[in-house]
């Protein structure tokens, strides 16, 4: 996972704030009054273990969301390529129908790319004959609308006797898989992790950082600044990364390369058309 300048800025700000807190405690300890309050070391260790467990679930959940998004997009791309090869093999003598279906599959993949990022714009699609792109923009779910149009064209080809029953079933399976993988993407997009859990975790980290100096201030002195810097870099960094990857389809550097995957799918389908 790469660091971006906003991430570094947030890390630096967090470290500076916690260091300012420690400097204040150190100043009070040495210049105003002696702080007799000491947190037992075992309590610090126990709280540290609890935080480690909380972060394990936090980072693990975010990574699994990222990985599930990658799998869904990969399966969609593989399904699009499989559909394109089947269409190419079944409709070699019907160039117009073949180009229509393959262009529509590219449109479907483009619409998925946009939908998972909260965009719905028919201007990003490839015009195909009488395809009502303007009407598609008004749909609540453009990918599903395009997928339905692909299914309708397959039904028409079978009714007209241009593809066999076996070919019809095979192509219909690909269309159904499109809907299944799209549903996974929509679930990831519309079901973020519970905010209460995240707020609870951040509050616990701040509480832990607040009591650490009272456990080691008499033993480490100014070296506590280095200890707290490393601690906050580690935990705050993990939280920021978790926050980024929990939305796998975003525009952050650590999010999935949705545009690159879409271009790769289009490149493969275009190669099939030209073959």
Question: Where are the model-predicted features located?
Answer:
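Residue-level signal for the membrane-embedded core of alpha-helical transmembrane segments
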Residues: 19, 51-54, 176, 204-208, ...
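Structured inter-helical modules in multipass membrane proteins
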Residues: 86-197
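Amphipathic, membrane-active segments
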Residues: 74-91
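Pore-lining and gate-forming transmembrane alpha-helices of multi-pass membrane transport proteins
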Residues: 49, 215-239, 243
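N-terminal juxtamembrane/topogenic regions of multi-pass membrane proteins
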Residues: 1-74, 93, 220-222, 239, ...
